Design a protein with these regions (language model features):
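Sec-dependent N-terminal signal peptides
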Residues: 3-13
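N-terminal mature-domain "stem" immediately C-terminal to a signal peptide or N-terminal signal-anchor/transmembrane
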Residues: 19-59, 63-67
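Pan-zinc metallopeptidase signature
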Residues: 207, 211-239
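Active-site metal-coordination segments of metallo-dependent hydrolases
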Residues: 172, 185-191, 204-209
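Acidic/His-rich structured neighborhood in mature extracellular/periplasmic domains
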Residues: 46-186
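Boundary at the C-terminal end of the N-terminal hydrophobic targeting segment
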Residues: 15-17
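Surface-exposed intrinsically disordered loops and tails
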Residues: 183-196, 228-239
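Active-site rim elements
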Residues: 53-56, 198-206
Length: 239
């Protein structure tokens, strides 16, 4: 478990409540493939993570997503991705975060119907981004969705002994089974009283539960959840 904890906390600890300085620029989208035709804005984050956004997304929100990704990948802010193995993996899969104005619009449908890669694990919508409340539950989903992408595209592949998403395959799967009060391949009708992770989305399979568990573990360590309002709001899923 000590090795698992070290791997988990090695990359995401310095995000502040508000991004004060952003050292990126929003460039025009140069990706001409059909899947990306709905995006006009692009940011390259440290050469290994891309942000694509529609024209209706403000530059401030696009830059916020880029800053969050940079903080997670380069915690000491020296301009170099902290984990070179994660960097290589993200590059190999062309990891990215697409930002859509709303669910089901033309840009989203075009992307969903034409994207054929392994670099996407989550998406963001305009209404989920608040640069003034970084990662705050119910206000800004940027930290959550970027963490999901880095974990899913990066960590689960680079460190399978720690983070493989199959049951009985990794330190993380064993830890999650304890947190859920047992091993459940689908969502149980009721979680045991001993469980402190009890996500009840019936559409979320075991691997999905793993990705969510990794997020909760990381942001708990980061301290993002350390206020009474947040603790109360998430108690149905995480204690």
């Amino acid at each position: 478990m000590k090795k698992l904890l070290l791997l988990l906390v090695a990359f995401p600890l310095l995000i502040s409540a508000q991004q004060n300085t952003v050292c990126f620029t929003v460039d025009p989208n140069q990706n001409s493939t059909t899947a990306f035709s709905g995006f006009t804005k692009y940011v390259d984050v440290l050469g290994c993570f891309s942000i694509y956004a529609e024209s209706t997304i403000t530059d401030a929100k696009v830059l916020h997503a880029a800053a969050v990704a940079a903080e997670l990948l380069d915690n000491n802010e020296d301009g170099i991705v902290d984990d070179p193995l994660i960097e290589v993996q993200l590059i190999s899969e062309s990891a990215l975060m697409p930002i859509f104005f709303q669910d089901g619009n033309a840009a989203m449908n075009t992307f969903a119907n034409n994207y054929n890669g392994n670099g996407v694990s989550a998406i963001l919508y305009n209404g989920e981004i608040d640069p003034t409340q970084t990662g705050h539950w119910g206000d800004d989903a940027t930290v959550e969705e970027v963490i999901h992408t880095i974990n899913h595209v990066g960590h689960t592949n680079v460190y399978p002994a720690a983070f493989s998403m199959q049951a009985n395959s990794s330190l993380m799967s064993s830890a999650m089974d304890v947190a859920r009060g047992g091993q459940f391949m689908s969502v149980p009708n009721n979680y045991p009283a001993s469980a402190w992770y009890h996500y009840d989305d019936q559409t979320c399979d075991y691997e999905c539960m793993m990705i969510e568990y990794m997020y909760w573990a990381i942001v708990s360590y980061m301290g993002i959840l350390n206020d009474p309002q947040t603790a109360q709001g998430i108690s149905d899923e995480w204690e």
